[in-house]
Regions:
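Structural and coupling elements of P-loop NTPases
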Residues: 1-531
Length: 531
């Protein structure tokens, strides 16, 4: 066994950050980069002409709207660890892309707004983490703003999400009265002070032991007494820390802080890195694949075309699951059943790219894609020909017919729509008999329609009109050999095919779905399909 290989893989930590929009996910991401030395100044405000854009928000439409539309991959070193952050879209309309990104993560950091508690998107993304049994760490952000009662916040997480919590630290006050956080293990209080620069630099923190008289004077007798009462309560009322339960995704360690003011970030990072694990074995068609003892293998979880105007190309993002990647190596592509060389391997810090000579299990690399890869594809070496578990495609919830305004640009239009669909931002469906002469687009959230229109115009020079169609539900026909043209009671149903030729049915409401199932014995419908 190569000791360097084991050492490199063991120092990897690969995680995603999930949250509801505006909970502070992008700000927290930037502060991690700040501590890792990957950036010198955090662009703390997005969307204003006089401010920097967030490092992780790089597409034009993201800059205009101040939202993370695509998923970026950010790597940096900190305290001997090599950290890979899978920065997921924070906007509620981009949960399917976020879902695929969570398939590549070993753990998740859940950011919660202290004034709001658990919100809709948090619930949806949390369920994905539970499905994968990955550890979930909670960072309750914006403690320096008006916040809900701390015990209420913990109860909210446990009741709504159904996961036990264990506070690692505890806040002293909140809002204008926020004085700092108490580390339950070391009994040290780190005091808070707002930073006039908006947290663009690392905050100066003063530490006091809980028994230090100076702390009581600083906090004030009323707040100090209230804090001591709360500490007695949590010692008896909350779960004890159990690292095995944490790693099984059954117990969430909770931290408090203010990402904007760079407060509580370093403490969180230090605990998080020690409590999480390096990459672990993944399930495949040949059982669990060990990350250290098995040769290089990876799977594609995202495809992005035309990442910026200087690079008219298509990049496949792949998560390395085992072994070591070396530039120029030949790999077996399971889907096409042939050997290929991975071209132009690179790691990305948003728009900035660097060519990589080597990478290890836990890392994410982007490789040039000659229209070969699809989401979920497995790559192997060493004579192995297994496949990792497929990534499900979830049923979209909004549908439009795409009308091309300039028939002379048909070729660019079809190429653009197809490429954007292969990236996973949209799903394309064709009329069952009409083929590509009529294209229906399905999306998880309506903002993706704007992204499609914007990208077709800016990147492919095609203007389109989107016409809503009166359907809200889509289901895959489980048995693709069924002739959907012979189904009964389908006058209000639209029959379509996906890009792989699988038959689907579009419905106006759930009642119609029930009627079709009742009148077609043996028909089974699915809400998602594995790639």
């Amino acid at each position: 066994m190569d000791d360097k290989l084991r050492e490199e893989i063991n120092r990897r930590r690969t995680f995603a950050i999930i949250s509801h929009p505006d909970a502070g996910k992008t700000t927290l991401t930037e502060k991690f980069l700040l501590f890792g030395g990957a950036i010198n100044t955090a662009g703390s405000v997005k969307g204003k002409a006089n401010s920097k854009y967030a490092v992780s928000d790089w597409m034009d439409i993201e800059k205009e709207r101040g939202i993370s539309v695509t998923s970026s991959v950010l790597q940096f070193n900190y305290d001997g660890y090599c950290i890979n952050i899978l920065d997921t879209p924070g906007h509620q309309d981009f949960s399917e892309d976020t879902y695929r990104t969570l398939m590549a993560a070993d753990s998740a950091v859940m950011v919660i707004d202290a004034s709001k508690g658990v919100e809709a998107q948090t619930i949806k993304l949390f369920k994905v983490c539970v499905m994968r049994h990955i550890p979930i760490f909670t960072f309750i952000n914006k403690m320096d703003r008006d916040a809900r009662d701390t015990f209420e916040l913990l109860d909210d997480i446990e009741t709504v999400l159904g996961i036990k919590t264990c506070p690692v630290n505890w806040p002293i006050g909140s809002g204008k009265e926020f004085k700092g956080v108490y580390d339950r293990k070391t009994k040290i209080v780190s005091t808070f002070q707002a930073i006039s620069t908006g947290g663009a630099k690392k905050a100066e923190e003063t530490d006091y032991h809980i028994d230090d008289e100076a702390l009581k004077e600083l906090v004030g007798p009323y707040l100090f007494d209230q804090f001591n009462e709360e500490i007695e309560l949590i010692d008896g009322a909350t779960e004890e820390m159990d690292i095995e339960k944490v790693r099984a995704g059954e117990l969430s360690p909770v931290f408090f802080g203010s990402a904007l003011n760079t407060f509580g970030i370093e403490q969180f990072l230090n605990y998080f890195l020690k409590m999480t694990t390096p990459p672990i074995g993944r399930n495949s068609s040949e059982g669990i694949i060990d990350p250290v003892t098995e040769p290089f293998s990876a799977f594609v979880f995202k495809i992005q075309a035309n990442m910026n105007k200087a690079h008219r190309d298509r990049i496949a993002f792949m998560r390395i699951c085992s072994g070591k990647f070396e530039a120029g190596m030949e790999v077996y592509h399971a889907a096409s059943k042939r050997k290929i060389k991975l071209s132009q391997p690179q790691q990305l810090m948003a728009q900035d790219r660097k060519i990589v000579d080597e990478a290890y299990a836990g890392d994410v690399i982007g490789v040039f894609d000659p229209d070969l890869f699809s989401i979920g594809d497995t790559l192997t070496t060493g004579g192995k020909k297994f496949e990792y578990e497929g990534i499900p495609t979830f049923a979209p919830e909004h549908f439009c017919r795409v009308v091309q305004l300039n028939s002379m640009k048909r070729k660019q239009f079809v190429k653009g729509v197809t490429q954007i669909a292969q990236e996973g931002a949209i799903q394309i469906f064709q009329e069952y008999t009409a083929g590509l002469s009529e294209i229906i687009v399905g999306v998880v959230g309506v903002l993706q329609f704007d992204v499609l229109k914007y990208r077709l115009e800016k990147e492919y020079g095609c203007e389109i009109r989107l016409e809503p169609i009166p359907y809200n539900y889509i289901r895959w026909v489980k048995d693709p050999t069924i002739d959907v043209t012979k189904l009964k009671r389908v006058s209000d149903v639209k029959k379509v095919k996906d890009m792989k030729g699988n038959p689907l049915l579009l419905f106006a409401n759930e009642w119609v779905i029930d009627q079709v199932l009742q009148h077609n014995e043996g028909l089974e419908l699915e809400e998602f399909r594995k790639n």
